[in-house]
């Protein structure tokens, strides 16, 4: 795998890896697939970016605390660690940090947001067919009845210290819940937009910060894209008005690295449910679309297992060409 990603191993991560290695055979197996990256330079001969890591629970941690420390969202941490109590995890417990990703299947520069994954990918000026620079961030998206719109749009305006003008629909919702809002929420700690906001060409929708960072990585917004304060600050500084934004619905992603085919599966949106058979058919369609001109061999049981787990972690399912399947 080529050098690529936004995460460098932290001291805590390295300590946790050593502790976990000493404690369990599982940790040894996980270390076999860890890929360390530095900077954000990438070569698209690999469709995978980032690094898979182990951490451990310190006394008083919640899973949300660990997620925030490692630039993760809540849901992706829950999917990767389903057996761990998110609010009262036992101190010393191993925690998988699922920060290894298959790139979305897109051909565009700019910002790409994958709704089921609740993750943003920011590509440089060229497409994934060439060398590019890329960053990735967890995001919150619209809940079921307030879904985030899909499709192509652009950044139309950037606002620092924005005031929030809640639309009538949100004013009515809060009033019905006994939590009335003012017609204008001024900039400051009570403003849910945070310190930075970028307006989208889809009227009424924004990419913005938050005053409730522990909600990042959940379907909790009224359709806007919400980011950790430190991430929106960086994105705001490096994004121009007119930047392209593409919002997609890709619960299943496939990619290749060093001749090995990987599958990354996330739960489908509740408004677009799919059973195992339909998800399997979609996986085969994606494989034919990406590798149709090449020979490839699959471990079909591995495909089915990944689709059942839906844990968001790239899983080896086969090989390209005449490589030996393992």
Feature-to-residue mapping (PLM):
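Bacterial N-terminal signal peptides
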Residues: 21-37
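Exported/periplasmic cell-wall-interacting domains
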Residues: 170-326
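N-terminal secretory signal peptides that target proteins for export/translocation
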Residues: 1-22
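Loop/turn positions that initiate beta-strands
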Residues: 60, 92-95, 242-245
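Solvent-exposed, polar/charged alpha-helical surfaces in well-ordered, non-transmembrane soluble domains
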Residues: 64-68, 75, 79, 222, ...
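Cell wall/extracellular polymer interaction/catalysis modules
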Residues: 73-75, 90-162, 270, 285-326
